[in-house]
Amino acid sequence: MDSNTVSSFQDILVRMSKMQLESSSGDLNGMITQFESLKLYRDLLGEAVMRMGDLHLLQSRNGKWREQLSQKFEEIRWLIEEVRHRLKNTESSFEQITFMQALQLLLEVEQEIRTFSFQLI
């Protein structure tokens, strides 16, 4: 896992938490939770790829891992749309920078998960 990606996730989560304190938006809290979940899932897939023998463990532990993978891609698409929507509607430069970084990170993570999943298939 790229250390820049880890720090990017942490930075964006901290920034979103600051925005949440100012706006008390429940939707933003949901986005933060999904970002954290997505990071954990990506990390697990990355670890499974590093230890290719874990593919069988992954499949036996979760017989529906392809279905779960599909669900994660849907979550990523939803997050991308939500971030784009918020980016269009915000006038705060702090929020614009945060959402632009979040969008870039989501696209990078989507590509990483695709790469990991192809290696596992």
UniProtKB/Swiss-Prot annotation:
Residues annotated as signal peptide: none
Assigned keywords, A-Z: Host nucleus, Host-virus interaction, Transport, Virion
InterPro entries named in the record: Flu_NS2 (IPR000968)
Localization terms from the record: Virion; Host nucleus
GO biological process: exit of virus from host cell nucleus through nuclear pore
Gene3D superfamilies cross-referenced by the UniProt entry: 1.10.287.230
Placement of sequence motif Nuclear export signal: 12-21, 85-94
GO cellular component: host cell nucleus; virion component
A UniProt-annotated Pfam family: Flu_NS2
Primary location group: virion
Family indicated by similarity: Belongs to the influenza viruses NEP family.
Quaternary structure and interacting proteins, as annotated: Interacts with protein M1. May interact with host nucleoporin RAB/HRB and exportin XPO1/CRM1.
HAMAP family assigned: INFV_NEP
Protein role: Mediates the nuclear export of encapsidated genomic RNAs (ribonucleoproteins, RNPs). Acts as an adapter between viral RNPs complexes and the nuclear export machinery of the cell. Possesses no intrinsic RNA-binding activity, but includes a C-terminal M1-binding domain. This domain is believed to allow recognition of RNPs bound to the protein M1.
Protein name as catalogued: Nuclear export protein
Originating organism: Influenza A virus (strain A/Gull/Maryland/1824/1978 H13N6)
Protein's gene: NS
